[in-house]
Amino acid sequence: MTTRPDAPASAAWTGQTGAPTRLLLLRHGQTALSVERRYSGHGDPELTPLGREQARAAAARLAGVPGVAAVLTSPLRRARQTAEAVAAATGAPLAVRDGLIETDFGAWEGLTFAEARERDPGLHAAWLGAEDVAPPGGESFADVGRRVAVERAAVVREHPGATVVLVSHVTPIKMLLREALQGGPGILYRLHLDLAALSIVDFYPDGGASVRLVNDTGHHPVSAR
């Protein structure tokens, strides 16, 4: 028998106690910077036409999930535009959560990988190898992990036993998956998350977690596949 990833959790399978808070983790749709594979942190590009199509497709998918209690989004425009489509489709209230914002890439904002490496070769190499190293004027992955963990705990506390959509960015979503899996820093570099991809994690009141889905893109429009 196959269980749908968005079906209610069973404690008999997880061994956890209490009703979990289910987080539906949705990455925002395409932007011009993502097309060009540029560092896109606190800059505020809007969705491309394809990005809007991806947002609508994800929203249609999530409209079929029963009982969505809230849609929480990063304050950045690309996430808010994606979240607005989801809120409209699900009828759930929409709220901005600053803790879901993407990494601040500082002086590397808008640069490609090669451009950032050429600008700051030593620092860039160190940044790739250590979570506590930050881009010039930016934020380390360790800092991102701490604020995302605080935000996750607040969401679970405020929505016990509920299903909540979190619309965010690649790094915060990876941090949430890493926390649930109790994984090391390597997961940040070895886990791929597509634009407008859906992941699902149950967080239990006893501190346990169950990852039910990672990087699902089955709802993507045909033009994006």
Task: Name these PLM-found stretches.
Residues 1-22, 58, 103-115, 157, ...:
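Acidic, low-complexity terminal tails and accessory targeting/binding regions
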Residues 2-11, 15-92:
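Active-site-proximal alpha-helix that buttresses catalytic centers in soluble enzyme cores
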Residues 23, 162-168:
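Generic beta-sheet signal
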Residues 31, 172-173:
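Short active-site segment of divalent metal-dependent hydrolases/proteases
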Residues 64-67, 155-162:
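Glycine-rich phosphate-binding loop signature in dinucleotide/nucleotide-binding domains
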Residues 73-74, 146, 167-168:
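Short beta-strand scaffold positions
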Residues 89-150, 210-215, 223-225:
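Phosphate-handling substructures
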